[in-house]
Amino acid sequence: MKIYKLQTPVNTILENIAADKSISHRFAIFSLLTQGENKARNYLLAQDTLNTLEIIKNLGAKIEQKDSCVKIIPPKEILSPNCILDCGNSGTAMRLMIGFLAGISGFFVLSGDKFLNNRPMRRISKPLTQIGARIYGRNEANLAPLCIEGQNLKAFNYKSEISSAQVKTAMILSAFRADNICTFSEISLSRNHSENMLKAMKAPMRVSNDGLNLEISPLKKPLKAQNIIIPNDPSSAFYFALAAIILPKSQIILKNILLNPTRIEAYKILQKMGAKLEMTITQNDFETIGEIRVESSKLNGIEVKDNIAWLIDEAPALAIAFALAKGKSNLVNAKELRVKESDRIAVMVENLKLCGVEAKEFDDGFEIEGGCELKSSKIKSYGDHRIAMSFAILGLLCGIEIDDSDCIKTSFPNFIEILSNLGARIDY
């Protein structure tokens, strides 16, 4: 895919940003804990979340879908499927399903694409094995394909060494099948969509005021079925917020965006860098929702070292902002970027250099010199949707060719359509 430099300003309202991926995954998986119909409007119709629907269908759920409206009726009993459960590119789907299936009678095989099957799963499989789960896979159950033989699980008191919503949610799901009350704690607050959704579903779970400590009781009855409207994804919206900032004389208003405090840290970083960016809350339901107004802005360099778990998905796009800021910027304490869909630290630095930007990597982050003269280049996405979308936005300024753009469909199927509607010329 080749993106040409955009010659005209952008002034628009975007209401069709992709639905939130985290909430879509959880809606589908948590529906298996209920009885009766679960309904979601604005479900994300991307490869990752469609794979999750296929997984729960193979476990016995009945699914009706009309456009982005999805209805799920869970089975009375989870089936042991006669096929591999394909998670595609989604680490969220695989890690949550490991936790869900560990305590269910049956034999299950989880696999994914070549990228997912090389991402670390021991952070889930190890604590589950310690409470009685039987999980088998390469490198001591660190790499998929993973085979899970459901077992009776023992209660646990687990302190996570990493701040990860995927680890947290997997342990919550396993706790629902344990033989007694379980506790979970983490070093810093990760995304809390699971807690918010499970609270609305009347799950037997208590959360401390700071959100760091959970007490989960085994399920004695099905949870309350869901009927929700899924807001738009702030991580997906971030690319177009960035576009408004870097394009001269431009303004974009992003509508119906999830404004959960654990999801808007990257926007706050842009504000600290000098961006003209306002967030307005319009609705408070099980999640906070609102709109984001962004205008062309001059950015200043910044050091980012806190709340990294809250901006891990936006880090590649933030690196683009760093490259266009005045002065030096760096991001540290972000070693988790090494084990995402690609090694995002190495890949961002490599590709920015190809575009004429001075950049260097650390073990846990990168440093970028802003204000370098940009040059048109061909970059590699390494199959990482967020790398591809980040450089697509940079391409609006200097022109860029991206070697693998199909990966964008895993999370944001209408990204290219929106980019084209802004006036971008795109060749395939």
UniProtKB/Swiss-Prot annotation:
3-phosphoshikimate binds at K21, S22, R26, S164, Q166, D313, K340. The keyword Transferase applies. One of its GO terms (cellular component) is cytoplasm. Belongs to the EPSP synthase family. Monomer. PANTHER family: AROM/DEHYDROQUINATE SYNTHASE, PENTAFUNCTIONAL AROM POLYPEPTIDE. This is 3-phosphoshikimate 1-carboxyvinyltransferase.
